[in-house]
């Protein structure tokens, strides 16, 4: 397996990651034996990055990935999970992010994840599912920093992209 540096984090990730989303369905609808066997084969092939989120099977993907990794105990597994803040929680973003991460860690059976991603789109003005640049810089990033300083994750990411110009505006 080939590995590449993940930005400036110091992490070396396999060029092929293991997606635990509902598209293939294994980590949401598969049997425990199939999940364990498939993850074990991925690890044997050199895969070290596992991507999950609460949105994948309403937390079931995180629960199943946590169980499998606890059983297999891979030495170099890198786990990333995500938060998608629902519009109904935009009035209390910090609490929503904190609760989501705490719940994800509990489902995964981990004290810390390697990468915690924001999964909302970002636009200049926000609206719908999208956060505004002001919400991200004023509320999301400070909350992420506080949670990182508390040791709940190592690195942050943004996966919901949105408006490229808005992402470059700050």
Annotate each predicted stretch with a short phrase.
Residues 1-77, 143, 149:
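N-terminal binding-site loop/beta-alpha segment at the start of enzyme catalytic domains
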Residues 51, 87, 130:
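Active-site oxyanion-binding pockets that recognize sulfate/phosphate
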Residues 27, 90-170:
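Glycine/proline-rich, positively charged
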Residues 71-95, 119-122:
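Structural motif corresponding to the early beta-alpha repeats
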Residues 21-23, 53-55, 82-86, 118-121, ...:
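Active-site beta-loop-alpha junctions enriched in small/polar residues
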Residues 12, 70-73, 82, 106, ...:
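Context-gated lysine
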Residues 17, 51, 78-81, 114-117, ...:
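Structural recognition of the beta-strand scaffold that forms the well-ordered cores
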């Amino acid at each position: 397996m080939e590995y590449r540096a993940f930005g400036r984090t110091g992490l070396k990730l396999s060029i092929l990651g293991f997606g635990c989303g509902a598209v293939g369905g294994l980590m949401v609808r598969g049997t425990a034996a199939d999940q364990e066997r498939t993850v074990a084969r991925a690890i044997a092939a050199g895969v070290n990055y596992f991507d999950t989120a609460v949105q994948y099977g309403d937390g079931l993907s995180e629960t199943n990935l946590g169980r499998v990794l606890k059983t297999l105990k891979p030495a170099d597994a890198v786990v990333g999970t995500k938060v998608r803040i629902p519009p109904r929680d935009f009035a209390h973003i910090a609490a929503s992010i904190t609760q989501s991460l705490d719940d994800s860690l509990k489902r995964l059976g981990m004290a810390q994840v390697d990468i915690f991603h924001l999964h909302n789109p970002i636009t200049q003005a926000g609206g719908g599912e999208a956060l505004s640049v002001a919400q991200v810089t004023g509320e999301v990033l400070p909350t992420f920093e506080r949670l990182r300083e508390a040791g709940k994750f190592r690195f942050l990411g943004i996966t919901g992209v949105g408006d490229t110009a808005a992402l470059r505006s700050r």
